[in-house]
Amino acid sequence: WIMGHMVNAIGQIDEFVNLGANSIETDVSFDDSANPQYTYHGVPCDCGRSCLKWENYNDFLKGLRSATTPGNSKYQSKLVLVVFDLKTGSLYDNQANEAGKKLAKNLLQHYWNNGNNGGRAYIVLSIPDLNHYPLIKGFTDTLTQEGHPELLEKVGYDFSGNDAIGDVANAYKKAGVTGHVWQSDGITNCLLRGLTRVREAVANRDSGKGYINKVYYWTVDKRASTRDALDAGVDGVMTNYPDVITDVMNEAAYKNKFRLATYEDNPWETFKK
């Protein structure tokens, strides 16, 4: 999965997919009442990027739905996975459950079209704080109560705070999550970060008894760091330059080992070599 980083304006969806991304990451900011409000990152953000692009969250969802609904004039068949980077740092811990409920209602209405031929992409809810694990239950309970538990088959989870792997496992236990887990590791492209924890996550994924199904590394903008990430065995790389990742994947060392994921590839299944 080549994951386009910080795709917060509707016009950027086509831009990143046309550069080779089959997945995008979108920031979601919340208002004081825990309503998802804008797709907005703000400053500071990655070096070389404009931090200020934004949409109203519901408008972005409608644009995303168009891009991921077969038959729509805006349809992009390659776009199969969306990571919502949930900026819950602005919320009190006791608002996490409420944020999950409201997120579910927004997605149900504006992305899934109330279960009636909505967008088809798989969705990862990425949460920066382990203490905000109740967001997951708020989300899953609400989709079930609204009569659409089947949509949970399209939803996965990530804790993005680079916490110790054991601590992340405990948070999932508390949240009642037993699958559909992506594990992120990374840092802004302005700084360097080694692959120690990535390798630990990959080992957990491949052990057969860990909690992790997929591992992605962010933010990867250079050919050398792309090769390092692929060599470490990641399933996804998040990038500001999808074309760079595409170029590396076409190199002799990688083109027979890796291919771009399609809609037929289940993002919740651990790949067996």
Curated annotation (Swiss-Prot):
Q: What is its EC number?
A: 4.6.1.-
Q: Which residues are in coiled coils?
A: none
Please give the Pfam families that the UniProt record associates with this protein: GDPD_2
Q: Key word DNA damage present in the record?
A: no
Its BP terms in the Gene Ontology are: killing of cells of another organism; lipid catabolic process
Catalyzed chemical reaction(s): an N-(acyl)-sphingosylphosphocholine = an N-(acyl)-sphingosyl-1,3-cyclic phosphate + choline; an N-(acyl)-sphingosylphosphoethanolamine = an N-(acyl)-sphingosyl-1,3-cyclic phosphate + ethanolamine; a 1-acyl-sn-glycero-3-phosphocholine = a 1-acyl-sn-glycero-2,3-cyclic phosphate + choline; a 1-acyl-sn-glycero-3-phosphoethanolamine = a 1-acyl-sn-glycero-2,3-cyclic phosphate + ethanolamine
> Which GO cellular component terms, listed alphabetically, does the Swiss-Prot or TrEMBL entry include?
extracellular region
Where it mainly occurs, coarsely classed, is secreted
State the free-text cofactor note: Binds 1 Mg(2+) ion per subunit.
Keyword Magnesium listed? yes
Give the InterPro entries listed for this entry: PLC-like_Pdiesterase_TIM-brl
Catalytic residues? H5, H41
- What cofactor does this protein call for? Mg(2+)
MF terms in GO = lyase activity; metal ion binding; phosphoric diester hydrolase activity; toxin activity
Entry binding sites for Mg(2+): E25, D27, D85
The Swiss-Prot or TrEMBL record describes its family as follows: Belongs to the arthropod phospholipase D family. Class II subfamily.
Briefly, what is this protein's role? Dermonecrotic toxins cleave the phosphodiester linkage between the phosphate and headgroup of certain phospholipids (sphingolipid and lysolipid substrates), forming an alcohol (often choline) and a cyclic phosphate. This toxin acts on sphingomyelin (SM). It may also act on ceramide phosphoethanolamine (CPE), lysophosphatidylcholine (LPC) and lysophosphatidylethanolamine (LPE), but not on lysophosphatidylserine (LPS), and lysophosphatidylglycerol (LPG). It acts by transphosphatidylation, releasing exclusively cyclic phosphate products as second products.
Name of the featured protein: Dermonecrotic toxin LspaSicTox-alphaIA2i
Q: Which organism is it from?
A: Loxosceles spadicea
